[in-house]
Amino acid sequence: NVIKKHKPELDMERVYLNAHTHGIEPHRHIDDGDYTIIYYPRLDWKTEWGGGTFVNDKFVEYKGNRLIIFTASMPHQAQAVSRQCYELRTCVVFKTNVKKD
């Protein structure tokens, strides 16, 4: 399990697939829980399509097979997808909490 490998002290609460296309304007938000983990599965994603993520005002480029982990209370926002992209921007999101003894 990818979470146990990178953050063994976490329990997974929810997991879901997030997806959007050009024309969808994501909003800046924070998550509940302790940590958010985002996995970018699209190996065919092109840099010029955009679709990365801003975490606490730092940009993380969408690269296939990339995993990012950050404190859930950090403001974050998906980057809009370019008009040149006719594909679906997808990411798998894991909402986690620190294990309680």
Residue ranges: model-predicted function:
Residues 1-67, 73-101:
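Fe(II)/2-oxoglutarate oxygenase catalytic core
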